[in-house]
Amino acid sequence: MSQPQTNVVFFDLEYYVPEQSRKKQGLAYNPWDSECRFLGGCFMAASASQDLHDGIDNYSGKMDAFWLWNYPSEAELVEAVFYYLSNIAEQGSRNGNRRVSPLLCGIGITHSDLPVLLDLFRRYGLLDNPKAFVFQNQFRSLDLSQLAVAMFNNSNRLLYPKAKNTILSKYTPDTLFESGRAVWTLYEQEKYRIIEERVVEEIACTHRGYVGILDDIRYLKGLEQEDKEMRQKYMV
């Protein structure tokens, strides 16, 4: 019996925050602030059996893009993203795999992108609170900012999520990114193509980070098994 495919959806979103709403630190974007803008982003639905390796050459060709400048309104952009994710959830159900839900994967998504999407779906009337609860439970999330904690020597006893560039400096050292705040200026200057290219590269790096972390986990588990076998061999 063949194993049903499970989608791992790598994604990255961008926002615009007007000057009067900008904070020095933290997430300045608020999905309920009518002056803020949800710019959209890209999603890459990867097959668990075929795409979770480091041999992908054309990342952009595997991505689905949703950008504000390609839609008449923010509401229609949000609606398009909602139906895209709903379709992925339905595909999982049709595959008959009830134990493994579609996995949403990114860096820092549990405190930013995922809550933002749910609130945008509520704001534009696509979900009420009970339906939002059901919707989010059709998915599972994997935040590399948390998963990567074990891949670093922590200087104290506080296990704290790692920043995007901290993770990328280990797994894609040739590619680092400016703060997401740089996108605000790009949007004001209408440099939309640069924003699009940035997001494609961010998702590519997230995918490479996923593969790199998986390889590290397997390596460490291999060392653990070797140590166990050595202890058993020389146990008196």
Which functions belong to the PLM regions below?
Residues 211, 215-236:
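C-terminal accessory extensions appended to soluble enzyme cores
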Residues 39-47, 135-139, 228-230:
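Short C-terminal domain-edge/linker segments immediately following a structured domain
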Residues 44-51, 140-145, 233-235:
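Low-complexity, flexible helical/coil segments
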Residues 27-33, 123-126, 161, 227-228:
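Short, low-complexity, polar/charged sequence segments that are solvent-exposed and flexible
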Residues 39, 61-62, 96-220:
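Metal-dependent phosphoesterase core characteristic of DEDDh/y 3'-5' exonuclease domains
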Residues 2-119:
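Conserved non-catalytic scaffold segment of RNase H-like nuclease domains
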